[in-house]
Regions:
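Active-site recognition of the HExxH zinc-binding catalytic motif
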Residues: 78-90
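Metalloprotease/metallohydrolase-associated module, dominated by Zn2+-dependent proteases
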Residues: 1-18, 22-70, 74, 90-137
């Protein structure tokens, strides 16, 4: 699914090496459940992963495992797209062209348009994921 989302919506990331990990810990930020996050790798992580992929990973995407297990494919795609929106390719940069950017609004303008059929998807998915964690306790 991640490859398909990248190919369809983010062709500029076609050469980026992205490691996807499932996060088994409930993470909060600003009182909200973190469904996914992405980080740019540092030199150490790139070096430690250069035997797995040429020159190491450029990004690591973390997806909440409970969210993934309890959500529909459309919601999974929404989370993946949202995280990919943070990625920026700066071809004029020295060194790696892969950067991170913040939100253009609380979300991204492009995501608002793509999710107009379900504008509160993140709240709904957060509640589903919270319920999955509560069942564990």
């Amino acid at each position: 699914m991640i490859r398909a989302v990248r190919a369809e919506h983010f062709p500029e990331l076609r050469n980026a090496e992205i490691l996807v990990l499932f996060d088994k810990k409930k993470r909060m930020s600003g009182g909200a459940l973190v469904l996914g996050r992405i980080q740019k790798t540092n030199d150490l992580i790139k070096k430690l992963s250069d035997e797995v992929v040429d020159e190491g990973y450029d990004y690591i995407m973390y997806l909440d495992k409970k969210m993934w297990e309890s959500s529909a494919d459309m919601d999974r795609e929404r989370v993946i797209r949202h995280e990919f929106r943070h990625c920026f390719v700066d071809l004029d940069a020295r060194g790696t062209p892969y950067k991170l950017i913040g939100h253009t609004i609380e979300d991204f303008y492009e995501e608002v348009e793509l999710n107009e059929d379900d504008p509160r998807w993140r709240v709904r998915l957060g509640e589903i994921t919270y319920a999955a964690y509560d069942m564990e306790d």
